[in-house]
Amino acid sequence: MSCILNPSHSISKKMISLKRYTLLIILLSACILSTAQKRLKTPLAFVPADSVVLWGESYNDLRGMALRVNKTLQARAVKPVGKAYKKALKAWKEETLPTATLTGACEKGLSERMLRNALLIEQAGGLFLESADSRFMDLSERVLWGDLMREVISPSPVSFEKHTASQALVDATGMIYATSGEDLWVNLFTNSTTHVLSDELNIIVDQMTGMPLEGRVKIRLTGYSRGRFHVRLHVRIPGWAVGRFEPKEKYVFSNDAKVDGVETGAASPITKTPTFYINGRESLTSVVENGYFVIDRTWNSGDEVMVEFPMLPYFVKEVGKDSASVAACHLFRGVLEYVPQQSDKDFRLSPNVGLKETESEDGVPLYEIKDAKENVVTFAPYISVW
């Protein structure tokens, strides 16, 4: 039997590969070149938390998990830093970033760490409104799901620390979306529905996702009035999805992970780009601004954007730390750090270690690694290990 190839189909596949490669180059170039946060002429505005309805299960629901701790919590609005921009940016660079860890704002005791985490969320939000720079949201995402949510869902009794963390989660619901004119920013990924109402916009935005465990995000735009409407949609591309980890002076990516004996290599988050679809068709445009994928178009009510972020394991190395150190290398998947379920102070993780992928009874991805004595060590998300 002979097989006749469709030339146009072959060319189409090549064009898609070329477009994806072009997008990868743009994203990586942005990672290298974006060093200074440029201030906007007019700051953005967050969509108020009261306009955002969150739904879902477990730690996907920022507000819901926080209200389990204290049902009376109310979101505090995060505002632009205004005239204090230069001072706030200096404090961010000289005080906040140098102390930032893989999951939180600092390595201090629990009380101070929760306070610093909450302050970081407020700082990041105010500076983001002045710059529209995704790096502020990258670190916010890491702190929210790396340390704050962990404290909120931990089995420990209600305490000052748990209350502080819960308040920060509630405040962050007012940072999920931002607007300016006909521009809409999607900053954080969580199941939500919001009514975006301004002089230029009057739309319903639905977001459906399995983040932070799954990499698929669906965004639906519905107009209140009849006919079509124009929106310039900005969807954040997380730093971890393109090989960027802040602060870069302290941490670097490594894509040497081997899962079930197969090197992730070219399919790692560093070399595999996020994929965007509009109404089921892949978008091959390559407009990226300040770490956001931009879709500028006139929409029909009910149009959908779907994003697939690479959710493969990767390693983060601490700059300047001896490779023989137990804490020199850390395992991540998406925004979540993975740690041993059983505490083992002598276990040393290295980038060339073999990973076996498995999952828990409730479907959470896990990784098994053999130690020097051939004992199996199971790694689970830090957020769920106490």
Task: Give residue ranges: language-model regions.
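Extended extracellular/luminal ectodomain segments enriched in beta-structured repeat modules
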Residues: 225-233
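C-terminal beta-rich recognition modules with glycine/proline-rich loops and embedded aromatic residues
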Residues: 39-54, 137-223, 245-277, 282-288, ...
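Long, well-ordered core segments of solenoidal/helical folds
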Residues: 49-52, 56, 60, 84-103, ...
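Sec-dependent signal peptide recognition
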Residues: 19-25
